[in-house]
Amino acid sequence: MLRDSVGGVETRHLDLNADLGEEVTDDEALLAVVTSANVACGYHAGSVAIMRAVCEEAARVGVSVGAQVSYADRENFGRVELEVSAEVLEEQVADQVGTLSQIAVSCGTEVRYVKPHGALYHRVVHDEVQAAAVLAGSGSLPVLGLPGGLLLSLAAGIGRQVLHEGFPDRAYLEDGRLVPRSEPGAVLTDAETIAMRAVELALQESPELHSLCVHGDTPGAVAHAHAVRRSLEAAGFGLRGL
């Protein structure tokens, strides 16, 4: 959360992001609500044509673009951990970021941050080798991820901008990690509950969050995003992209 003060009145700012370009949701409808788009780079979902379509619309409506990098695993939608060497993973991340960057620039925008997807997102919370590979492959981009994990710790240690992310549509474990999707209740589906949870996360002081994510592949994602945005704005938050 960022704070601005104008005329003595403090405004709290937060980002609302969603995973896009995965061919499982209405990208255009979500881009009308969110402020940042985590764009699939072809390794778990998406294609050059889809990346271009998302980037064009994001540029048109003023939504920030981020590279959603993944294991090379379209069969499992990037949700299975893979044993990949650091060298290979670094090359794969660099390929994804580079491809999306070229497309984004051609559409009049740019890649503003990197965020791992699925199994890789959770792996780099505790795996130093893979976390370092993601950082090495993503240049100097700001890094969006789960607070308290190795990825963000390593990123901060080398001077990268670190962005803390929260998930109002997911259940949490006591240690701050997300409940695995395989467990009952891991994914929340009631829009009102998700919206209330979003405000709770936005107001928490430790860790302070920079962005909230609404999963684009969850049924009702567009309605969830609208509910979250309405609740955040009603709570006094201004929304802006990363």
Indicate where each model-derived feature is located:
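N-terminal glycine-/serine-/threonine-rich phosphate-binding loop
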Residues: 2-63, 102-106
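Active-site rim beta-loop-alpha module in soluble metabolic enzymes
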Residues: 150-203
